[in-house]
């Protein structure tokens, strides 16, 4: 005689209750440190270590502060910008404060690569993220990720199709100075991205990070205020519109 297996109402109740909890009130950098494992190749990973990139913590924590509507980070390549600000923010959002999010890479090829190598491996090695992924195969492909709580992650590239119609609480633009200056005749990427978060009012956040790569428009320019960047387009133009924080190293 074959026995029948039935679902447990208690188990379903516990699972549903997990996703009805309010957001975890912790600094974003602390959430990343607690929940994100950084892949080292395909099969190994290590916990995020914020002591390796201490200059990232203030920018990362500003991502959850409602008095700001954007974070602009300009810095050299290979300094942990994408890992901390992009991948880390994604992990924090999934575990601590679920909401729809759009990540925009500089090309469709880079969006696919980011999803299949960095994000897929990070999700696999981070237990709290892995258990929140939707079990349905149809809910998880290269550019679209659904989670058990109903939140959605889109990994796209600079096109008016990606920037149109949908609303997101969080939008992240990576390698911004490699974006087209005008996207499909509709404007710059940051302006288009910022419009996607307006529905969420002060809770919405737009992030742009990049190493500077645009031409200076006035070669005779001289700085007239602290931390002012040269006149140009792209990430430094956005940086000049903000409060212009800068990290200083203490020598000796």
Please name every model-derived segment.
Residues 2-252:
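Phosphate/NTP-binding elements of NTP-utilizing enzymes
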